[in-house]
Amino acid sequence: MFPLVEFCISNMAKGGDYVYDKLENDPDVDVLEYGCLNNCSVCSCGLYALVDGDTVEGDTPDELLKNIYKHIEENDFTNLL
């Protein structure tokens, strides 16, 4: 089972699309895009994604990507089988 990273399309327009594209090319991560994830207070403040339901944030696309991988590693989602 791979970790699921979910993106709000509005947040992708702020730079999250870069992170989405990077993760989409990672065979060990599943990514989904939604019209809205109902996290408007988080979305309006900066970049974020949901990693298996947990909010992960970053000030820049590179920081968000780094924080997503850090969250995945710390929670070891790859060993849930």
Curated annotation (Swiss-Prot):
Transmembrane segments: none annotated. It comes from the Bacteria. Pfam families: DUF1450. Signal peptide: none annotated. InterPro entries: DUF1450, UPF0349. Coiled coil: none annotated. NCBIfam families: PRK13669.1 (NF010190). Belongs to the UPF0349 family. This is UPF0349 protein SH2012.
